[in-house]
Amino acid sequence: KPKNLIIGEKSVRYYELNHGERLQFEPKRLNKLTFLSRLAFVNEMSNYENYQIRVWKDDTIYGTYFFSTEKSEDSIIKEDKKVIPGKWRSCEINLSKSKHTYSVELLDKGKKVFVRCLGNQ
């Protein structure tokens, strides 16, 4: 589910990711992928929270990443202003030359994140 994160006057598309779901990517002609993630803060959460994401390469775990984040004061989700995005956190993965499918999943039950994928050549 794409969501528009508003930062000042700029709108950036992120994809909502809930526990139990995976977002898949099939990069072509790239050397590196950067996954940007922002935790969705809702009312009962404190100002600082932790979360974990796991990156898969085909059916093999590529890596598990643990993040600590805090609420962002200058960004909102256009489609749901009650949800406050956290400050962005990222992980980079190096890609092999052959074709692979990469996916990312959230490991924390009861939480959701917004994910964006950037490719580098």
Where are each of the predicted segments found?
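Glycan-recognition and processing domains
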Residues: 1-27, 41-45, 66, 72-83, ...
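Tight coil/turn sites that cap or link beta-strands
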Residues: 10, 18-20, 30, 97-100, ...
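A short beta-strand element within beta-rich, extracytoplasmic domains
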Residues: 29-42, 104-105
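Beta-strand-rich ligand-recognition modules
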Residues: 57-119
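Conserved long hydrophobic alpha-helices within structured protein cores
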Residues: 25-35, 59-65
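Short coil-to-beta strand junction motifs in C2/discoidin
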Residues: 45-54
